[in-house]
C-alpha cells in the first residue's frame, strides 16, 4: 500500500483586499456636490473651503465647482478646496 505522510500546515496564505485609497479627482477638475475627492486613512489631505470630511476621513465636495489643491499654514498642510462654479 502506497502511503504519503501528511504535509505540515503553513502560517502564510492570507491577504487582505486592496482598499482603493487615493486621490479620486485632481486639481482643476470639475466636481459635483457630494463627489468624492480623496479616500484616505487619517488626514494626509485636510478639508478646505466647500469640502467636507467623512468619518473615515474621506474628503468630498459640498458644492459644485472646481478642485484646488494647496499647501497652507505653518505646518505645510495639504488642503483641498472647491471653488464654486
Swiss-Prot record:
GO cellular component terms given for this protein: cytosolic large ribosomal subunit
Keyword Cytoplasm assigned: no
Annotated spans, Disordered: 1-24
Pfam families noted in UniProt: Ribosomal_L27
GO process terms (BP): translation
Protein keywords: Ribonucleoprotein, Ribosomal protein
InterPro entries: Ribosomal_bL27, Ribosomal_bL27_CS
Keyword Magnesium: no
GO molecular function: structural constituent of ribosome
SUPFAM superfamilies: Ribosomal L27 protein-like
Lineage: superkingdom: Bacteria
Similarity remark: Belongs to the bacterial ribosomal protein bL27 family.
NCBIfam families: L27
PANTHER family documented for this protein: LARGE RIBOSOMAL SUBUNIT PROTEIN BL27M, RIBOSOMAL PROTEIN L27
Protein name in the entry: Large ribosomal subunit protein bL27
Organism listed in the record: Nitrosomonas eutropha (strain DSM 101675 / C91 / Nm57)
Amino acid at each position: 500500500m502506497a502511503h504519503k505522510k501528511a504535509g505540515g500546515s503553513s502560517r502564510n496564505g492570507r491577504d487582505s483586499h486592496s482598499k482603493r485609497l487615493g486621490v479620486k479627482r485632481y486639481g482643476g477638475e470639475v466636481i459635483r456636490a457630494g463627489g468624492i475627492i480623496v479616500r484616505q486613512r487619517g488626514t494626509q489631505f485636510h478639508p478646505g473651503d466647500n469640502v467636507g470630511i467623512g468619518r473615515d476621513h474621506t474628503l468630498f465636495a459640498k458644492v459644485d465647482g472646481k478642485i484646488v489643491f494647496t499647501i497652507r499654514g505653518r505646518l505645510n498642510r495639504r488642503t483641498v478646496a472647491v471653488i464654486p462654479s
